[in-house]
């Protein structure tokens, strides 16, 4: 059923004076707020109850109607005139102030592109002078020729002479017209002439203009009233025609054309939205409802008020004062000053910060105006509409919950009783333990035992959501079934910590309670912790066990020769476990187990089962217990081929086990990498729920046996290593030699530094390799066990403990040439300690900056892609997207192999190998096997379906998107893939480096920007820092390369025999040689490409491929895998607009920017009507600019540049169709994604099914 409360669209436009009066419930006449004695609202004041409604439900202000009686609704009190209704109306009822003098709206005057100035074709500065009573303006030319219409009479020091001259000429004309020397006006004119001629004497401009007006019908004005007069005269249709004629004039400069197009857009927008320009000048202003600008009583009888009230008070006071001044007949200079002050007071109300001198409060800080209330992080949009504080929530420190199942979280009892209070009360009433709410609440206060029973029952059906800030990706909020625990800490399952990026060193988490039936169903079906096995960014398992769990399973699967009970053969599992539990055999002893005792699904050969045994350990028997019977037996670390690998451990009973053990090699234990593979393989064959069940068993085994292994570290485990001093001696000699060379002038400073660093790096590597060898000799050394298993630490840590710390970074992040020779075991000297703190401190500062930078990147990415949702199954596109392995051509190494780019995507067309055999047909989902097949066929590039070529008008289709990496199945309709893409690119942002690598001026190398700065450079489409590559503008052949002492001139000959010359920077690295064929858009020199140039010369596809390759390069260099499809979504949004260059016979305007889909529709329409279609040029917008070009003004305004976006939307009278997610969140609608698009029926059925099963 359709929700009738759902808002369909929202429109914004200029309000005319009558509209403002129609909103109002009364005029505010006095600046007073509330009476200081009675604390009641003053009559006709800013809080008047007659205008805005009663402060208490159904009670009037005079006390005649005291008892709140809903029966009186709609009545007005006969005495005080207050309407009796709910006090909530004070949040919606508006008032108004009738202004004594019109004022301009500051947004229309001062927000670029200065709308009023554009309409009147004036300079913004000149117009401001008119509005703020500095300069007069000509309203009507009359029958004089010295002043043109709309000319500003500038009395500023630079141009006052010219104005004086013109006034003199006009006055001389007046004298000629009067033609009577004795006339009083002639005498006045002569006096004025004298004043104007003598620059040292001041003159009255009012007197001069009124005299000229009297005899020439010319009209002069000043202030907003003059602007209003001119705006009323504007004929939109005539202006549009005139501008179009001017645009046809080819002699116009680009700047003039841009200015004309801006004006044309303004006039066209106003005409289409049926708005009048004079509405930009206000004669009446609305007063917002009082509960939105409240007065609050503080302790001690003092009051605090919203700053907007102060701004309204100033307006009312100045308005009243202007009335009085006018009534008194004061001189024009005083009246104009009052008018200017009124204009400034209204400016301060609308946008105080835009004023040159903002109105300040007592604390010398600008008062918050209506614009300030809207914009920024603390503004209405981001603080109150896009995110709100939520009821039924709690927060506490997290602690580990080793006994929890993967779908559970431990909630402290006191927290749970408060969170579920309403449900507990309901349960007590339903089961007749309490007759009403009051009794139930009393039972809660007294800790009645029945309350705890009620709580236990209530939480069975109600999952809770756990969230850890910062929520960088969708796994930052997951649902769990609550389990009541003692203490005050929330207990978290150890395996979900990776997804939350949580650890137990004091992190806090928030708990939220889903309330409605649909919310509960969604939590259980879509968000349960046990279903989040794979990470969305790369489809790899995110619940990989760590630390103790790895250690326990490593110990469990270790094999040891000559341990207690070696060579025993058991007929059943129980027998083996009993022997272990009674101390007969060691956990790691090699033993035999009859195949008949093991599951038939794993060992199906009947003959073998009767006559053979498996060589294994008790530990491995325990380990294999955690898997299903149809999962292969794991007996070695060959996981992918476990079924075949296990066969080499099966022996016939006729073979003597002791001899067998003597001849076999000890197998490596299961390490972190193997555990990850097992989880991935298990997920592929068994799905999420079963994998979660297996993981819980793996966790229990790991904890149990890591405890039994008793692995600890002591100083004794850290072996002494004295051999290093010989290495140091040799290195010191080499360094001395290098320094001597430098002193003799044979090396530059940077070369000396590089060589010294190389020497010490070599020493550290040598020591590290030797230590690794030493460490491997003692496989029982706890440090070796931890490093080898992948539980914690690595060889480099160990080197620092025993060998040397090595080279450190300085505060700039560059490497220092003096190494730290001591190890932590020996202890550092004071100077060494000081050196080592430098880099550490920089690391901390970097992380802090990086976190903020990465967070802002994510926010911009979300804003640019949030409207992309999977809307249908197949868009049937006309073209595909060609992919091949991404190769770094400079170093000739593969960044992303073709297989990674194919898995999880759909083919666009049939794929054949060289022998014309069909490898995969069109519209087939490419899985690992098909991808392997394609690569084995020797195919190097494949055309696939991509979001970049998806033909949907909005959103994407299932086939162009492909696999949902988080579920390893085809993406569902309604999936908000745009937001997931943004999170997947933004979430690893904190792991990217902040550094720009400098090569220290070594010739032949190019400084490269990497890490986060490079990502920002690409996605913001800014000119690259460092070396910018020269790209060819034409197709052709390099005919000659001229070398002028390191500056090259590259000559390219095109097919038409034209020669194009490119001059390089000094010492540029060339990418072409004589005779090379080049394509338009191809690099001629090393460096980063300017994307605007590439779009112009290479085209859209080149830009798409370049951004994709470069972004992947940055992430892969840091070892972060991100799926192509996420980057493609962002690129799609950056390139989905075109600029109209010629409007043809369509309604589009030249210079207008629209989406490619809309453009295609208009062209199609023109072709059908047989009229000239518009022409366009592709545009690229960075992720900072793209959201501002969004079709939704609500979404754009809440992103950045609120005032500018809203001004533009107002002029266009824009309607927001509420197609994206943000707009709907703001208006309280369900978002058009997920169940908001497809309904909740399916999810509710799923939830029911999951509720009945344990996992």
UniProtKB/Swiss-Prot annotation:
Cofactors demanded by this protein: Mg(2+); Zn(2+)
Cellular component terms per the entry's GO annotation: DNA-directed RNA polymerase complex
GO terms of biological process kind: DNA-templated transcription
The record's note on quaternary structure and interaction partners says:
The RNAP catalytic core consists of 2 alpha, 1 beta, 1 beta' and 1 omega subunit. When a sigma factor is associated with the core the holoenzyme is formed, which can initiate transcription.
Its annotated function is as follows: DNA-dependent RNA polymerase catalyzes the transcription of DNA into RNA using the four ribonucleoside triphosphates as substrates.
Q: Which family does it belong to?
A: Belongs to the RNA polymerase beta' chain family.
Please provide the record's keywords in A-Z order. DNA-directed RNA polymerase, Magnesium, Metal-binding, Nucleotidyltransferase, Transcription, Transferase, Zinc
**Matches recorded under Pfam families:** RNA_pol_Rpb1_1, RNA_pol_Rpb1_2, RNA_pol_Rpb1_3, RNA_pol_Rpb1_4, RNA_pol_Rpb1_5
- Report residues binding Mg(2+): 503, 505, 507
Q: Can you tell me which residues bind Zn(2+) 2?
A: 875, 950, 957, 960
> SMART domains, alphabetically?
RPOLA_N (SM00663)
Q: Which GO terms describe its molecular function?
A: DNA binding; DNA-directed RNA polymerase activity; magnesium ion binding; zinc ion binding
Where is Zn(2+) 1 annotated to bind?
A: 60, 62, 77, 80
Q: Which organism is it from?
A: Mycoplasma capricolum subsp. capricolum (strain California kid / ATCC 27343 / NCTC 10154)
Q: Which reaction does it catalyse?
A: RNA(n) + a ribonucleoside 5'-triphosphate = RNA(n+1) + diphosphate
**Name of the gene:** rpoC
Q: What is this protein called?
A: DNA-directed RNA polymerase subunit beta'
E.C. no: 2.7.7.6
Q: InterPro entries, per this entry?
A: DNA-dir_RpoC_beta_prime, DNA-dir_RpoC_beta_prime_bact, RNA_pol_asu, RNA_pol_N, RNA_pol_Rpb1_1, RNA_pol_Rpb1_3, RNA_pol_Rpb1_3_sf, RNA_pol_Rpb1_4
Q: How is the cofactor bound?
A: Binds 1 Mg(2+) ion per subunit. Binds 2 Zn(2+) ions per subunit.
Say which enzyme class the record assigns.
transferase
């Amino acid at each position: 059923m359709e929700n009738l409360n759902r808002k369909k669209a929202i429109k914004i436009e200029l309000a005319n004076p009558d509209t403002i009066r129609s909103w109002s419930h009364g005029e505010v006449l006095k600046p007073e707020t509330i009476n200081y004695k009675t604390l009641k609202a003053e009559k006709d004041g800013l809080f008047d109850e007659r205008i805005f409604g009663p402060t208490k439900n159904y009670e009037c202000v005079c006390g005649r109607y005291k008892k709140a009686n809903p029966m009186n609704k709609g009545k007005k009190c006969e005495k005080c005139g207050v309407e009796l209704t709910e006090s909530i109306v004070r949040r919606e009822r508006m008032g108004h102030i009738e202004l004594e003098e019109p004022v301009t709206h500051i947004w229309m005057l001062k927000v670029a592109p200065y709308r009023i100035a554009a309409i009147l074709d004036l300079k913004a500065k000149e117009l401001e002078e008119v509005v703020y009573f500095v300069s007069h303006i000509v309203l009507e030319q009359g029958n004089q020729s010295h002043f043109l219409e709309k000319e500003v009479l500038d009395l500023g020091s630079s141009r006052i002479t010219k104005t004086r001259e013109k006034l003199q000429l006009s006055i001389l004309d007046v004298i000629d017209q009067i033609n009577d020397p004795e006339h009083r006006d002639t005498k006045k004119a002569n006096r004025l002439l004298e004043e104007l001629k003598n620059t040292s004497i001041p003159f009255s401009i009012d007197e001069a203009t009124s005299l000229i007006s009297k005899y020439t019908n010319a009209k002069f004005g000043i202030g907003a009233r003059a602007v209003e007069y001119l705006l009323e005269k504007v004929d939109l249709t005539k202006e549009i025609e005139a501008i179009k004629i001017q645009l046809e004039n080819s002699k116009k400069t680009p700047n003039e054309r841009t200015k004309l197009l801006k004006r044309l857009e303004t006039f066209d927008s106003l005409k289409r939205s049926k708005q009048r320009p004079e509405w930009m000048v206000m004669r009446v202003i609305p007063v917002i409802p009082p509960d939105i600008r409240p007065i609050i009583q503080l302790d001690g009888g003092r009051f605090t008020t919203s700053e907007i009230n102060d701004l309204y008070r100033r307006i009312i006071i100045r308005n009243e004062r202007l009335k009085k001044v006018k009534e008194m007949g004061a001189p024009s200079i005083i009246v104009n000053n009052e008018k200017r002050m009124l204009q400034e007071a209204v400016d301060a109300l609308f946008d105080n910060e835009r004023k040159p001198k903002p109105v300040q409060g007592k604390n010398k800080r600008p008062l918050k105006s209506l614009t300030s209330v809207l914009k920024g992080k603390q503004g209405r949009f981001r603080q109150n509409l896009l995110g709100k504080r939520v009821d039924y929530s709690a927060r506490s420190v997290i602690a580990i919950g080793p006994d929890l199942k993967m779908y559970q979280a431990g909630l402290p009892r006191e927290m749970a009783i408060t969170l579920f209070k309403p449900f507990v009360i309901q349960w007590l009433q339903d089961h007749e333990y309490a007759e009403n709410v009051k009794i139930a609440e009393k039972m809660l206060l007294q800790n009645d035992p029945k309350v705890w029973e009620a709580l236990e029952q209530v939480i069975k059906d109600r999952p809770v959501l756990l969230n850890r800030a910062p929520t960088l990706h969708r796994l930052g909020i997951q649902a769990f079934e609550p389990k009541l625990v003692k203490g005050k800490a929330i207990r978290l399952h150890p395996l979900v910590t990776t997804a939350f990026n949580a650890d137990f060193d004091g992190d806090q988490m928030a708990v939220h309670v889903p309330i409605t039936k649909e919310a509960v169903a969604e939590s259980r079906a879509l968000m349960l912790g046990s279903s989040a096995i794979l990470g969305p960014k790369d489809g790899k398992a995110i619940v990989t066990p760590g630390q103790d769990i790895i250690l326990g399973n490593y110990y469990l699967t270790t094999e040891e020769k000559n341990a207690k009970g070696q060579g025993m053969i058991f007929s059943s599992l129980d027998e083996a476990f009993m022997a272990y539990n009674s101390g007969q055999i060691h956990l790691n002893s090699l033993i035999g187990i009859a195949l008949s005792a093991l599951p038939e699904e794993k060992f199906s050969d009947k003959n073998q089962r009767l006559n053979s045994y498996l060589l294994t350990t008790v530990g491995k028997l325990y380990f294999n217990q955690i898997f299903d019977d149809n999962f292969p037996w794991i007996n070695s670390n060959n996981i992918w081929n476990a079924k075949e690998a296990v066969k080499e451990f099966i022996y016939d009973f006729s073979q003597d086990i002791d001899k067998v053990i003597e001849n076999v090699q000890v197998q490596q234990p299961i390490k972190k990498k193997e555990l990850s593979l097992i989880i991935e393989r298990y997920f592929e064959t068994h799905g999420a729920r079963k994998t979660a069940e297996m993981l819980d068993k793996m966790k229990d085994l790991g904890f149990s046996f890591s405890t039994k292994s008793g692995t600890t570290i002591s100083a004794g485990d850290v072996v002494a290593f004295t051999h290093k001093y010989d290495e140091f001696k040799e290195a010191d000699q080499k360094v001395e030699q290098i320094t001597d060379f430098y002193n003799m002038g044979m090396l530059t400073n940077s070369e000396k530094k590089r060589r010294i660093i190389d020497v010490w790096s070599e020493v550290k590597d040598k020591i590290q390799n030797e230590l690794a060898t030493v460490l491997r000799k003692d496989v029982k050394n706890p440090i070796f066990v931890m490093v080898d298993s992948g539980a914690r630490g690595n060889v480099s840590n160990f080197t620092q403990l025993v060998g040397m710390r090595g080279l450190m970074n300085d505060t700039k992040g560059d490497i220092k040439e003096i190494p730290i020779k001591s190890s932590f075991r020996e202890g550092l000297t004071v100077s060494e300690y000081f050196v080592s703190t430098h880099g550490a401190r920089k690391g901390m500062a970097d992380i802090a900056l990086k976190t903020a930078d990465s967070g802002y990147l994510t926010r911009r990415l979300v804003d640019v892609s949030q409207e992309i949702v999977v809307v249908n199954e197949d868009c049937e596109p006309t073209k595909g997207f060609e992919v091949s392995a991404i190769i770094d051509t400079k170093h000739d190494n593969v960044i992303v192999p073709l297989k990674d780019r194919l898995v999880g995507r759909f083919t666009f067309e049939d794929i054949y190998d060289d022998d014309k055999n069909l490898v995969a047909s069109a519209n087939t989902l490419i899985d690992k096997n098909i991808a392997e097949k394609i690569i084995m066929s020797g195919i190097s590039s494949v055309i696939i379906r991509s979001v970049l070529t998806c033909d949907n008008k909005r959103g994407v289709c299932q086939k162009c998107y492909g696999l949902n990496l988080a579920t390893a199945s085809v993406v569902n309709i309604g999936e908000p893939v745009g937001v997931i893409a943004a999170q997947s690119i933004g979430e690893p942002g904190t792991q990217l480096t902040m550094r720009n690598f400098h090569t220290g001026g070594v010739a032949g190398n190019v400084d490269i920007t990497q890490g986060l700065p490079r990502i920002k450079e690409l996605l913001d489409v800014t000119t690259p820092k460092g070396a910018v590559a020269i790209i060819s503008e034409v197709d052709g052949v390099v005919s000659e390369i001229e070398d002028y002492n390191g500056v090259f001139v590259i000559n390219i000959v095109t097919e038409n025999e034209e020669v194009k010359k490119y001059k390089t920077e000094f010492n540029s690295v060339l990418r072409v040689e004589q005779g090379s064929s080049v394509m338009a858009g191809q690099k001629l020199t090393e460096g980063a490409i300017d994307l605007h140039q590439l779009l112009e010369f290479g085209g859209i596809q080149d830009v798409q491929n370049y951004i994709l390759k470069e972004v992947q390069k940055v992430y892969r260099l840091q070892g972060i895998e991100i799926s192509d499809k996420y980057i493609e979504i962002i690129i799609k949004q950056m390139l989905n607009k075109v600029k109209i260059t010629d409007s043809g016979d369509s309604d589009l305007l030249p210079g207008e920017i629209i989406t490619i889909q809309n453009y295609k529709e208009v062209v199609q329409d023109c072709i059908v009507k047989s009229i000239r279609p518009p022409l366009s040029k592709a545009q690229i917008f960075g992720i900072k600019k793209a959201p501002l070009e969004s079709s939704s003004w609500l979404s754009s305004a809440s992103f950045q540049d609120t005032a500018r976006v809203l001004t533009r939307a107002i002029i266009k009278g824009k309607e927001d169709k509420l197609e994206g997610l943000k707009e709907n969140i703001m208006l309280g609608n369900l978002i058009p994604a997920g169940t908001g698009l497809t309904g909740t029926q399916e999810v509710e059925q799923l939830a029911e099914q999951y509720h009945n099963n344990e996992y």
